[in-house]
Amino acid sequence: MKAQELREKSVEELKTELLNLLREQFNLRMQAASGQLQQSHLLKQVRHNIARVKTLLTEKAGA
């Protein structure tokens, strides 16, 4: 997910996206804990995407 794509979204869409990413992160962590996660790089990608969304929400709140 690119930052430019996220910038075009509204605050409500960003909040929905954040919720989806947090759920995905939870599922990936559970898979990693049980040894089922083959692609461990997905955890890092999701974490970075969560940071991007949170940053944009903060920017939009201040604007």
Swiss-Prot record:
GO terms for biological process: translation. InterPro entries: Ribosomal_protein_uL29, Ribosomal_uL29, Ribosomal_uL29_CS, Ribosomal_uL29_sf. One of its GO terms (molecular function) is structural constituent of ribosome. GO terms for cellular component: cytosolic large ribosomal subunit. Keywords: Ribonucleoprotein, Ribosomal protein. Coiled coil: none annotated. Belongs to the universal ribosomal protein uL29 family. HAMAP family: Ribosomal_uL29 (MF_00374). This is Large ribosomal subunit protein uL29. It comes from Photorhabdus laumondii subsp. laumondii (strain DSM 15139 / CIP 105565 / TT01).
